[in-house]
Amino acid sequence: MFDLSNKTVFITGIGSGIGLATAQVALKIGATVYGTVFSEEQSETITGYIPSECIYKVDVKNSDEITFAVDDAAKCSGKLDGIVAVAGILSLQEFTKTDDAIWHNVIDTNLSGSFYSARAAIPHLQKQAAASIVFVSSQIGLVGHPLGAAYAASKAGINGLTKSTAVELAPNSIRVNAVAPGPVVSDMTAKARADEKRYNSLLADIPMGRFGQPEEIATIINFLLSEASSFITGQVIVADGGFTAH
């Protein structure tokens, strides 16, 4: 198993799903973890895993809030070795019914929030001999999906952000990668899983015949944070049970 001993990692969206699983795996392999939630209720839920002083209630659409949280975490820990931008939202509706408010909320949360998080972290990451940024994309950022224009655009944007930033930061020994999950068992997919017809339709498109588990995606993310992936940068790693392979 790869190791994050003596590493400090900041993770957005640790209140549930992939973010929570990423924090749990990171803690298990030795990391000190700081992270963001969007509600007090989420904060209370995860205090059993992470001390309350390491949890920040943040709106990732607000660059000032995320910058303060990252700076404060780096100050408290004395350093920052990696950041993972997980926080995101899913909104599905017809293209012509995607109004300005929906569009901006999805783009600002998923894409701008990821950008703000990385931008806040880079000055701290540059102080380390080696550091890592991991974004969370989606298979929907790689293939078409009906009703998902805003979400697909936000995730495709993350793919471009990953590659451009990786090339720019490579001379600073900062690696930048993304993970693109397929459907995962989480709050985000709860509605789809509750609809038997829709759920079975989704399963039919996944050669492995199941949704992924948050821990499976979290393991890939932590691999990318670790020195076990020291020659990997600029990659969008797809974990979708074979969906995009056919």
Regions found by a protein language model. Give the residues of each.
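Substrate-binding pocket helix/loop in short-chain dehydrogenase/reductase
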Residues: 94-95, 99-107, 202
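Conserved glycine-rich cofactor-binding loop
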Residues: 15-17
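Short, small/polar-rich loop/turn modules that mediate ligand/substrate recognition or access, typified
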Residues: 84, 170, 175, 232-234
